[in-house]
Amino acid sequence: MAGRRAGLIVQICVLAMGLALGLAPPARAETSSPFDAWAVVVVAGDWRGAGGGPTKAFDNARRDIAARLSDRGFDADRIRQFSVKPESALARQATAKAIYETLSAESAQAPGCMVYVTSHGDPQGVVVGDLILPPNILGLMIDRSCGAKPTVVVVSACFSGVFVPALAKPNRMILTAARPDRTSFGCGEADTYPYFDDCFLQVLKDAAHFAVLARGVQACVAAREIREGVSLPSEPQIWIGPQLRPLLPLLTFAAPASP
């Protein structure tokens, strides 16, 4: 009798443990993004609008693009922001030297790099503060920091297509807001974002990977410029190196956060 009672107690204990395990919430699988260790630099290179007065367009884009990248799988702690007029601890003072030093430090152990610059531009390069950052110098900065790692470079500025020849490497994707001989739009004093940056934010919300993002941004900018009656479209440029091209569909963004 005592043996039967002991056996019954053991069975009850086993049953209770099984019920407890069955009722416990399932363990969550650890998920990671292919971009969660990438080095990212996002730069707002000017504070002046097209008319010379102050504008928030570039800093709005810098702040919100950094946030959207974090939402899609980039580690917020690895995203470094730069502004000509930083208004919070999130952004550092934008100079070519500071950008290069930060990119070099952050990319040392990173598997990939992303550089995003939004500013005014001219056929010689992109504005960073009171200086022009030319394509060959930006190219050297990225060569010496990111090297052969997968790298995505986005330049949102007038005439930004001039950066493609200097930056094009087999391991890189280059996306620019305009052809080398065209202006881009939306950098006035009253604009919230430049058109290109606005489209980047919209398309990044749901895009699967960078190649889809780039094509979507091109289409979005073209549609916006038609709506606005732009007579000479900016024609954003895409260049994808042969080493990176087959990898991009595998480097998928994390699922967007629920609204």
Residue spans of the language-model regions?
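Active-site-proximal C-terminal subdomain of hydrolase catalytic domains
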Residues: V152-G241
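Boundary/activation segment at the start of structured domains
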Residues: G22, P26-P111, G186-P194, I240, ...
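Stable alpha-helical elements in mature extracytoplasmic
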Residues: P54, F58-I65, T95-T102, P134-M141, ...
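N-terminal secretory signal peptides that target proteins for export/translocation
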Residues: M1-A6
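A short, glycine/acidic-enriched catalytic loop
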Residues: A108, V117-G147
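Structural recognition of the beta-strand scaffold that forms the well-ordered cores
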Residues: A39-A44, R78-S83, C113-T118, T151-S156, ...
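Solvent-exposed loop/turn segments at secondary-structure junctions
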Residues: D46-A50, K85-A89, S119-G125, L131-I132, ...
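Bacterial N-terminal signal peptides
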Residues: I9-G22
